[in-house]
UniProtKB/Swiss-Prot annotation:
It comes from Paraburkholderia phymatum (strain DSM 17167 / CIP 108236 / LMG 21445 / STM815) (Burkholderia phymatum). Part of the 50S ribosomal subunit. Contacts protein L32. Belongs to the bacterial ribosomal protein bL17 family. This is Large ribosomal subunit protein bL17. GO terms for biological process: translation.
Length: 131
């Protein structure tokens, strides 16, 4: 009986699952929006939201905890310098998961995972219109 087990296995070994969630966390922190399958998105939320909560209190201990989980210096820097102050007044719920249809090859349900309060990309649109 698998009562009270917290994470989905996602048909992977534990090391593969850890590496996959670490890579997806780094991608989400870097790009602020990623497209993935719905079960992976739901598991990613359980990993990234505690990291952003760590980023709200910039201490050396929290930086080391975040680096231990992410293993990427640039992601940790962005987490504490950009995302922590952005979500300082929000008490949780930093991600939005939007259903995004189904994948063509295997009909897997897809999802768009994005950080809330992202800055708008109006500057890029204005440059495109000017050309």
């Amino acid at each position: 009986m698998r009562h009270r087990h917290g994470l989905r296995k996602l048909n992977r070994t534990s090391s593969h699952r850890l590496a996959m969630l670490r890579n997806m966390s780094n991608s989400l922190i870097e790009h602020e929006v990623i497209k993935t399958t719905l079960p992976k998105a739901k598991e990613l939320r359980k990993v990234v939201e505690p990291l952003i909560t760590l980023g709200k209190k910039p201490s050396l201990a929290n930086r080391r905890l975040a680096f231990n989980r992410l293993r990427d210096r640039d992601s940790v820097t962005k987490l504490f310098d950009v995302l922590g102050p952005r979500f300082a007044n929000r008490p949780g719920g930093y991600l939005r998961i939007l259903k995004f249809g189904f994948r063509v090859g295997d009909n897997a349900p897809m999802a768009l995972v994005e950080l809330l309060d992202r800055p708008e990309v109006e500057e890029v649109e204005n440059v495109a219109e000017a050309e």
